[in-house]
Design a protein with these regions (language model features):
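Bacterial extracytoplasmic/cell-wall-associated proteins, especially those involved in peptidoglycan
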Residues: 1-141
Length: 141
């Protein structure tokens, strides 16, 4: 869990909230659906993916594809720092189940799928305004 938190956010104040989202999803029986685990499976952890994930990659069943598997991947996907480990051990008490990039380097968190979809739409607008060319599907992390 800590390695996923490490890869999901570099914003110190978000780590415990990101960890809470993953704990909440597991408690609800939801899949983690987090892009960094898919990227690890695609690259074997050997390189950075300098593009958005393709739908075919999200649909490919690998032990690290948390869109396709239940629970955590079989191994860490990174070497987590102390702050990510602490966040995983003591996540926030939070109602959130979703998050998406907010355009500032951080994330917008949501309790419901409807809230999340609105946040994703805002992120897509930011991407369009910045001229981003991605093939990334709607993120649910």
């Amino acid at each position: 869990m800590a390695s996923i938190v490490e890869k999901e956010t570099g914003v110190p104040d978000e780590r415990r909230t990101v960890a809470a989202v993953f704990v909440n999803r597991m408690r609800e029986g939801m899949r983690l659906q987090t892009d960094p685990t898919v990227i690890y499976g695609v690259t074997g952890g050997k390189e950075v993916l300098d593009r958005g994930l393709r739908r075919s990659e999200l649909n490919r069943k690998t032990p690290y594809n948390t869109y396709q598997i239940d629970g955590l991947p079989p191994t860490p996907i990174a070497n987590p720092g102390r702050a990510a480990i602490e966040a995983a051990l003591a996540p926030d008490e939070s109602p959130y189940l979703y998050f998406v990039a907010d355009g500032s380097g951080g994330h917008a968190f949501a309790r419901t799928l409807a809230e999340h979809e609105a946040n994703v739409a805002r992120w897509r607008e930011i991407e369009r305004a910045q001229g981003a060319d991605t093939e990334s599907p709607v993120q649910t992390d």
